[in-house]
């Protein structure tokens, strides 16, 4: 009989493993309490979802024991780790004249997968493992001027997900630094602007 280590965000998880005797009785012991499992008769056994009580976050020792009709006993031990903590991911609003900008933000889990969604399209980002994530320059298609909704989602190995949203504003219109230019009127029609016409 066998059981692999498990990492999950389900605090009452189903458990499954292998058993080489289709008639053996299988019992799963979690934190010192026995739970009868089902021998499926196909080389696997199952402890149904929600059979276990709610388990606290952290590692739990699991021992599975199979007893055949002759009284022979086999067992295996594994660890089920419960992780219901959400990753923390963030992205700030950004205004830029780059139509295919790089994006970066913070992530508290160096093992989480990070995906950036811009205008409804997903783009895999890089978790740098140092508390930051990055979507490389020129990964995005050329974006039109104006605001774009950006959502960044992090998923940890246990399956917990968290999302943050921000606004990416593209502005490629040059600023009007000069302002309006007023040309004095040639009041006497001589083709020359004199001091009176210039207002000096």
Identify the meaning behind each predicted range.
Residues 2-11, 93-99, 185-200:
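Short, solvent-exposed loop/linker segments at the N-terminal edge
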Residues 18-25, 106-113:
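Short proline/glycine-enriched turn/loop motifs at strand-loop junctions of beta-rich domains
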Residues 43-50, 131-138:
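Short strand-edge motifs at loop-to-beta-strand transitions and within beta-strands
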Residues 51-59, 138-147:
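Surface-exposed, short loops/turns at beta-strand junctions within beta-sandwich domains
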Residues 69-75, 157-163:
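Short, exposed coil/turn segments at beta-strand boundaries within extracellular/luminal domains
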Residues 74-87, 164-184:
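Flexible, low-complexity linkers/stalks enriched in Thr/Pro that connect modular domains
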């Amino acid at each position: 009989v066998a059981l692999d280590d498990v990492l999950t965000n389900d605090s009452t998880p189903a458990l499954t493993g292998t058993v080489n005797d289709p008639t053996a009785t299988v019992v799963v012991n979690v934190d010192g309490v026995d739970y009868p499992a089902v021998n499926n008769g196909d080389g696997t056994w199952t402890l149904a979802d929600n059979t276990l009580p709610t388990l606290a976050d952290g590692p739990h020792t699991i021992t599975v024991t199979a007893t055949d009709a002759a009284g022979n006993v086999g067992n295996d031990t594994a660890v089920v780790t419960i992780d219901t903590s959400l990753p923390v991911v963030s992205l700030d609003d950004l205004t830029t004249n780059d139509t295919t900008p790089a994006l970066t933000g913070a992530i508290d889990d160096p093992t989480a997968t990070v995906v950036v969604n811009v205008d409804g399209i997903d783009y895999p980002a890089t978790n740098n493992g140092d508390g930051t994530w990055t979507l490389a320059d020129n990964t995005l298609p050329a974006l039109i001027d104006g605001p774009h909704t950006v959502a960044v989602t992090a998923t940890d190995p246990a399956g917990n997900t968290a999302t943050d949203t921000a606004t990416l504003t593209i502005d490629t219109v040059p600023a009007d630094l000069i302002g309006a230019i007023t040309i004095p009127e040639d009041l006497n029609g001589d083709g020359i602007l004199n001091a009176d016409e210039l207002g000096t």
